[in-house]
Amino acid sequence: MRNNAKTKIAILLVISMLLSGCTGGETEQEPEEIPGCMDEAAENYNPDATVSDRSCIYPEPEPEPEPEPDVRLASQSEFCDDVNPHHCMLPFPAPAFLVDDGTTATGYRLHIPGEAIPDSGSGTSDEFHMINRVDGYSPSTQIFTTFESTPDVSGMADQYSIGDSLDSGHSTLLINLDTGELLPHWVEVDMRSQDDEATFVYIRTIRGLDHDASYGVGYRNLVDSGGNSIEGSDAFVALRDGLTTDSPQIESQRAQYEGLFEALGGAGVERASLQAAWFFHTASTASILQDIVHMRDDASQRLGDDGIGCNVTEVVDGYGDDNATFRLIRGTFSTPQYMESDYPPAEMRRDSSGTPEFIEFREVVFTILIPQILADEGRSGLMTVLGHGFMGDGDGMATGSREFANLTGRVMIATDWKGWSADGDFDALTYSLINVEYFQHQHERHMQSIVNNLAMIRTFTGV
């Protein structure tokens, strides 16, 4: 028994020792990880996060305030050239209407929106599709601008002293920016200006400008009739003097104006002396002639070498009773037509690309005068194609050339030059004062007249 008791005591001691190793104290637990943003500068900072999960979101930095422009322009428009505050399209030709276009020969395309074109008293103006098709300004363009007061031009080159415009101190300059050539010109003000309007100051060239060429214009050291110096517009002064403006258009042109000022400086012009200056680019030959060349080629193919035909409606022997005319012949000939109507105002039919489109053949009047001397001498004579004056007609020119025809032994032939003829064009031009868009339709009639003359010559040389 005693041994059993000792055995039990020994077992209890061992068990108690083992239990003391397991229960002698609590084991520490690893802390729970809390992922989140731990950056106090972040918008989504989590103060309870113990592990960064890279989820921090930071506020957008406050944009730097735009610097205050040096000049705030009172006259701004998305449709106008902001350089001149007096008129939307000034200075003219305005560089603001030249749009970059890599598909054209010049790299530009002219775009004058309808909102920029002066409205008549009868309605608003639309853009001119004929103008906006070309890749620059006309080489025959007018060049002019306005100032706050009218300059005294008495000391500048006029039409009798054009050579003075090339003097080193002359107040106006016209320079070819591609070649550096100074162009002779004269200066005049618009004598028809009204008291409540700024006066146009023109630079008149003595010849057409080069095609596809850049030009610069400069006015400097101008004074008014009282001898007071004339200030440039706020926009121009900002460009000249390097002052910033609140006009995106002005700022977008600044680099090009810097090039202009550099070119004028190379011609001896002090930058500070300028009161107005601008640049423009003329259209390419292909762009200017694209409509009429297409019409000519299309009409030539339709006409062939001998034309389509003619109808004689009247023959008068001995016309004029002055022994100068053997025979006067009147009639019509067939001509390819591209105008919607023979009667103005009418527009040219064009396809979706703006190219003139053939409509049909129509009959156009002609007059032929054969001088008496050819009949008397039994010989033929050269044929002379006549034009006519403003609002005239071909018949009047042919019948009025009897003496000249008989003296020279030439056969006279003529038709009306539509657009400036007595055949309804006076009324059409009157309508153009109401709707200026009609002016471009008159130009389209001119092109049709060229085709008419081509058809007339083909027809009668083929007889």
Label each residue range with its predicted role.
Residues 341-364, 376-463:
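Cap/lid segment of the alpha/beta-hydrolase catalytic domain
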Residues 67-344:
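Acidic, low-complexity Ser/Thr/Gly/Pro-rich repeat segments typical of extracellular/periplasmic
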Residues 1-32:
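Secretory targeting signatures
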Residues 26-67:
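Extracellular calcium-associated, cysteine-rich motifs in secreted modular proteins
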Residues 193-220, 224-225, 359-401:
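A conserved hydrophobic secondary-structure block that centers on an alpha-helix together
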Residues 1, 24, 150-156, 338-341, ...:
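Short regulatory "switch" loops immediately downstream of catalytic or recognition motifs
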